[in-house]
């Protein structure tokens, strides 16, 4: 259904909906929740909240109000329920966002997330389309959370690598979002989540009418992610992502399979993927690297070629 005030809907597979309420203010609406990917309930709450809040940052906005979405089995201890909610609350406070209530239902397994409302100026909305030939793509978080959380279940990675992936997933995109909003000539932005870098890059490329080439050798990776991927520890979601983009992807002879696997890896609370001219990307990178030293240029956009995506 069309509405003149609906500035961003579901037609471009964007990260959130945006609705204009005045000439100065537009409301960003998004919702996200999932089952636990970690055993610690407080950490689960933090990660789920950071993941939900990320969509607002990807749209160029700031989150302001949220509602809890919680599904719990009867057997889940009350202390665990409390810890999940406290973890989510802690991230909301860090984001400057008020949790004003929510809804809880009984379910066979726990699920948690947020419905988030944010604000943005109608003229400063960032979308996942609009990349232009000559733009480079900047990624603000390393890849590998899907591979590593799969490896954790089999106790295959070191405690240090485990703690690092937990920290990455629980980190808000707030600082990165602030840096991106301050950057010049940002043409497109999205966050890298369940469809992996390949899937979200394809959505950006196809919606923008460009070809995006990703460079495997420049991808920032979480500690031990490459080792695990080379061992064949690849989550099922990565294969689904590869099937999704395969008709639209040219894999060049220089590509290494391990980097292709990690580009398809589904991310939880992943980083922002930003398209902007190279001359504007350099100062953005300098700002990002003051708090996210792994931030990197991972590809570039060009005039459309045979496929929307290329990987070398």
Describe the role of every protein-language-model region:
Residues 1-312:
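Helix-biased detector of long, well-ordered alpha-helical tracts
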């Amino acid at each position: 259904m069309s509405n003149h005030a609906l500035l961003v809907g579901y037609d471009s597979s964007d990260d959130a909906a945006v609705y204009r309420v005045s000439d100065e203010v537009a409301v960003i609406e998004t919702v996200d929740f999932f089952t636990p990917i970690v055993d610690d309930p407080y950490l689960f709450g933090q990660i789920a909240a950071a993941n939900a809040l990320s969509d607002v940052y990807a749209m160029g906005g700031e989150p302001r109000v949220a509602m809890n979405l919680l599904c719990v089995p009867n057997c889940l201890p009350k202390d665990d329920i409390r810890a999940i909610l406290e973890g989510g609350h802690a991230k909301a406070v860090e984001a400057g966002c008020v949790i004003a209530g929510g809804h809880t239902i009984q379910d066979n397994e726990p699920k948690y997330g947020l419905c988030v409302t944010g604000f943005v100026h109608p003229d400063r909305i960032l979308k996942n389309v609009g990349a232009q030939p000559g733009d480079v793509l900047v990624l603000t978080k390393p890849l590998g959370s899907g591979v590593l959380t799969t490896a954790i279940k089999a106790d295959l990675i070191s405690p240090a690598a485990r703690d690092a992936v937990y920290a990455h997933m629980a980190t808000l995109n707030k600082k990165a979002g602030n840096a991106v909003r301050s950057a010049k000539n940002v043409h497109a932005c999205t966050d890298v989540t369940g469809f992996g870098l390949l899937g979200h890059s394809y959505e950006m490329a196809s919606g923008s009418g460009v070809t995006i080439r990703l460079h495997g050798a420049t991808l920032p990776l979480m500690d031990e992610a490459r080792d695990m991927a080379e061992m064949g520890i690849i989550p099922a979601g990565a294969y689904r992502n590869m099937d999704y983009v395969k008709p639209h992807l040219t894999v060049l002879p220089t590509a290494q399979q391990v980097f292709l696997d990690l580009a398809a890896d589904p991310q939880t609370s992943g980083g922002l993927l930003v398209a902007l001219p190279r001359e504007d990307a350099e100062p953005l990178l300098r700002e990002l690297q003051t708090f996210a030293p792994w931030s990197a240029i991972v590809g570039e956009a060009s005039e459309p070629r045979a496929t929307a995506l290329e990987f070398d």
